[in-house]
Design a protein with these regions (language model features):
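N-terminal leader/propeptide and maturation segments of large enzyme subunits in energy/redox metabolism
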Residues: 1-37
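Conserved catalytic cores of very large enzyme subunits
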Residues: 1-6, 35-42, 46-173
């Protein structure tokens, strides 16, 4: 039964992502601004790929991260879920794309700024009494931006600083 539950959950995640892909395509079909249309088509391609087939780029990894973060929040009602060492698990995608010229630091920062805005959107369904006291407050996200690995080596990287910059750019709690 456990494995059946895992399969059901994974299938649901893939259907969830596909719905975003469909919506992005529909929005692109109605869009008159060429730049925005291209952006929506990229979003659609990313949503068709991740998380089902795994990310191959920083942009896809950001989208996959966001889907997983949303669904974890939904499953746990926002309790004890945070991005943790985001800068570590996202770095290989960032570095590869930067090195092969498919990503600029500026666009990577824009994607991270967008994630920071979305992280601030997260909230939870509350009972009436709790809603009165907590309405409008985001869940807050704990995120580590530097540190050491198990050998004591500094593993701070560009994304560590870009996380801090994202906080400065969006200026949200």
């Amino acid at each position: 039964r456990f494995l059946q539950a895992v399969i059901i959950s994974c299938d649901a995640v893939m259907r969830y992502a596909k719905r975003y892909a469909v919506l992005a395509k529909e929005m692109a079909a109605k869009e008159s601004n060429a730049a925005r249309k291209a952006e929506l088509l990229t979003i659609a391609r990313n949503c068709e790929r991740v998380p089902a087939k795994g990310a191959t780029s920083f942009h896809e990894a950001c989208q996959s991260f966001w889907f997983v973060q949303q669904l974890l929040q939904l499953e746990s009602s926002g309790h004890s879920i945070s991005p943790g060492r985001f800068y570590q698990y996202m770095y290989p995608y960032y570095k590869k794309d930067l090195d092969n010229g498919t990503l600029t630091r500026e666009f990577a920062q824009e994607l991270m700024d967008c994630i920071w805005v979305k992280l601030n959107d997260l909230n939870k369904c509350r009972d009436a009494a709790s809603a009165e006291g907590f309405a409008g407050y985001s869940l807050f996200q704990n995120l580590i931006v530097g540190g050491q690995n198990e050998d004591g080596r500094d593993v701070t990287n560009d994304l560590s600083f870009m996380c801090i910059t994202a906080s400065e750019h969006v200026f949200l709690p």
